[in-house]
């Protein structure tokens, strides 16, 4: 009886595919495309040395203590990037694989990229379904830091107030991120004479719009901040494995979704491991725990996006 063996399926997968998936995830995920990537992790936990105390300089008074110089110190705290595993399983009918008239990867690859990018953004920005040893999502962290500005309906003024929050923490805003509905608001942003405000500082800042369905418009209209202060590291690049004898269960209730051998199916399991953190070191403008490199525009009770 003719069957599709694992080696037969492996021949459909080129080595470069894993790299293409990884590059696609980085491109499609706003977190991975906007945050700063650190060198790959060598274990499941990476320690970050974070500046916690700044040195203090003194003028020397020759009339006091024979001009003796004062001493000072610096201090470092530590934070950790914890690697979490992200995986997806794509079941495929063997008959589909036998259809030479279609490009299997052209159908499967975009869905894998989409699933990974969406899960990463949900966890990193909003803390939705995040691993237990990951920090809070970016928006919940902004709320905890008291770095929210209430929306007034005057977008230009609102963005200015959000940027001021970041600047008072000692950081410079290098990007603004929001949902796709924010595009229309930017197009309507004009001065008192009705002219577009594209030549101002706010108009020149990089704008990004999340279009993967993750953005929660009821929690935040937009985020502004220094996105280089959010960092991530990869523990394991995208890897794949072909399954042909497995049983796939529903994680929510344990019910069997597919019995690959019985259902004449194979499944592609794709895995990557990564972690992230916001070091938030002290700086000359703000040495207190109130500082945070991001701020959010809190939507009105009836969001307009």
PLM feature spans:
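Extended oligomerization regions of viral-like shell subunits
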Residues: 42, 144-266, 272, 301-305
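Protruding loop/beta-arch "assembly-hinge" segments enriched in small, turn-prone residues
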Residues: 1-39, 259-305
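Short, Φ-rich (hydrophobic/aromatic) sequence segments
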Residues: 16-31, 104-108, 112-116, 120, ...
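Structured loops at beta-to-helix junctions and adjacent beta-edge loops in soluble globular domains
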Residues: 49-52, 93, 179-181, 210, ...
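Short loop/turn segments at secondary-structure transitions that flank enzyme active sites
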Residues: 54-56, 87, 96, 118, ...
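Assembly/oligomerization interface modules of large self-assembling protein complexes
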Residues: 2-88
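Short conserved micro-motifs at the rims of enzyme active sites and ligand-binding pockets
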Residues: 59-61, 102, 187-191, 218-222, ...
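Alpha-helical scaffold segments that mediate packing/assembly in large oligomeric complexes
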Residues: 77-80, 87-168, 296-305
């Amino acid at each position: 009886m003719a069957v599709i063996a694992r080696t037969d399926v492996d021949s459909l997968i080129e080595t470069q595919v894993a790299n293409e998936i990884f590059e696609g995830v980085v491109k499609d995920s706003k977190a991975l495309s906007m945050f700063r990537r650190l060198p790959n992790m060598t274990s499941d936990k990476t320690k970050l040395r974070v500046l916690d105390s700044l040195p203090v300089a003194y003028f020397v008074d020759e009339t006091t203590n024979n001009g003796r110089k004062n001493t000072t110190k610096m201090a470092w705290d530590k934070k950790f990037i914890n690697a979490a595993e992200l995986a997806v399983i794509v079941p495929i009918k063997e008959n589909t694989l036998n259809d030479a008239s279609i490009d299997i990867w052209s159908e499967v690859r975009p869905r894998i990229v989409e699933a990974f990018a969406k899960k990463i953004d949900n966890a990193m920005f909003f803390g939705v379904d995040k691993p237990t040893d990951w920090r809070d999502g970016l928006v919940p962290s902004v709320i905890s830091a008291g770095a929210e500005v209430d929306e007034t309906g005057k977008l230009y003024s609102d963005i200015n107030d959000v940027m001021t929050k970041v600047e008072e923490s000692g950081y410079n805003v290098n990007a603004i991120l929001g949902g796709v509905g924010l595009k229309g608001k930017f197009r309507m942003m004009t001065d008192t004479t009705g002219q577009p405000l594209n030549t101002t500082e706010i108009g020149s800042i990089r704008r990004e719009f999340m279009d993967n369905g993750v953005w929660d418009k009821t929690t935040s209209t937009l985020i502004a901040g220094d996105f280089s202060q959010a960092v991530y590291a990869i523990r394991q690049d995208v890897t794949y494995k072909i399954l042909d004898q497995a049983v796939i269960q529903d994680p929510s209730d344990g019910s069997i979704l597919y019995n690959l051998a019985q259902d004449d199916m194979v499944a592609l399991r794709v895995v990557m491991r990564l972690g992230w953190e916001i070091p938030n070191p002290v700086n000359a403008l703000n040495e207190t725990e109130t500082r945070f490199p991001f701020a959010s525009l809190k939507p009105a009770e009836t969001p307009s996006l």
